Regions:
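Domain-level marker for long, solvent-exposed, non-transmembrane regions
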Residues: 18-294
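Bacterial N-terminal signal peptides
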Residues: 4-16
Length: 294
């Protein structure tokens, strides 16, 4: 049924080639906040002319692209236990996803005389928008402005800890208190940029000549970011667990960066900048007289 729907959607496809887009590896690009897919089709042997063969091959390639995009969207993890395929059981989510696939952008196309190939996709923002209404606890909230006091954002450095990206993440203190989740964020902010920015780095977070208790802030991080990089783990249900002291700092911070989703998760840290001495990384922020429990 879904494949017949894709044939209908083909008629309304937004098709245009954008300069500068090269062929890309298909998949869910969490660190780029988008989905990339490839569609291909072979020209039918019975085509009346070479022009007709190319047109029919392109049509088949676009349908293949849409089919592949649908599979990718269905596989997007909403949380540790749920995917978008589960959410698409609801009519409003399925209709929204179908509309997104119908309006997919074609970034690049090629024709070698036999096979027509098209690359396209869309931002994960569209996926978040489709599923937002079904996420428990997500609601419209007043978004505060950062006025230079306290920490402006949160960085969770998981190092080598296995982490599977999802639309929703959950953060708890070591004692079990919920610190971050959909119930803490503004829905519009969630749709626009997601609950967190995801970064992957291949370098080691710790310089080889530094003692283990010396750490630094990623070079790309904001000056007033609260960076937590040690005594951090994943629990059995896929939640990120941080020290109680770090959780207290988040809750007492003068700017609630959770509401506008000013959170970053990295699997490894980039180049070091500065040195800090605490069992979790904690930068002194404007408006705080001293770091809490270093």
């Amino acid at each position: 049924m879904l494949f017949s729907l894709l044939g209908f959607l083909l008629g309304g496809l937004l098709f245009h080639a954008l300069p500068g887009y090269a062929a890309e590896e298909p998949g869910i690009r969490w660190n780029e906040d988008r989905i990339v897919a490839l569609g291909q089709a072979v020209a039918p042997s019975g085509a009346a002319s070479s022009g007709s063969a190319r047109l029919l091959a392109r049509r088949g390639a676009v349908m293949d692209l849409q089919r592949n995009l649908l599979e990718y969207v269905q596989g997007v993890r909403v949380d540790a236990k749920t995917t978008m395929e589960n959410y698409m059981a609801h009519d409003e989510v399925r209709t929204s996803v179908e509309g997104t696939i119908k309006g997919v952008e074609i970034w690049r196309s090629s024709w070698d005389g036999e096979i027509y190939s098209v690359w396209g996709g869309f931002s994960l923002q569209k996926v978040r928008q489709s599923g937002a209404s079904r996420i428990p606890g997500l609601a419209s909230r007043s978004v505060p402005s950062y006025e230079g006091k306290g920490y402006s954002s949160l960085v969770l450095d998981l190092g080598d800890i296995p982490f599977e990206p999802s639309l929703v993440i959950s953060l708890r203190s070591a004692s079990g208190k919920k610190i971050y989740g959909p119930e803490f964020v503004d829905e519009a902010s969630f749709v626009e940029k997601g609950m967190y920015r995801y970064e992957e780095h291949t370098g080691s977070w710790k310089s080889s000549f530094l003692p283990s208790f010396l750490k630094g802030t990623p070079a790309w991080a904001e000056e007033n970011a609260l960076v937590i990089s040690q005594d951090i783990r994943m629990n059995e249900v896929g939640e990120i667990v941080i020290p109680d002291e770090a959780a207290e700092v988040i809750e007492r911070n003068s700017f609630d960066f959770r509401i506008p989703c000013e959170v970053t998760v990295i699997t490894k840290t980039a180049a070091l900048r500065g040195f800090l001495n605490s069992f979790f990384v904690l930068r002194r922020a404007p408006g705080l007289s001293s770091p809490e429990k270093p």
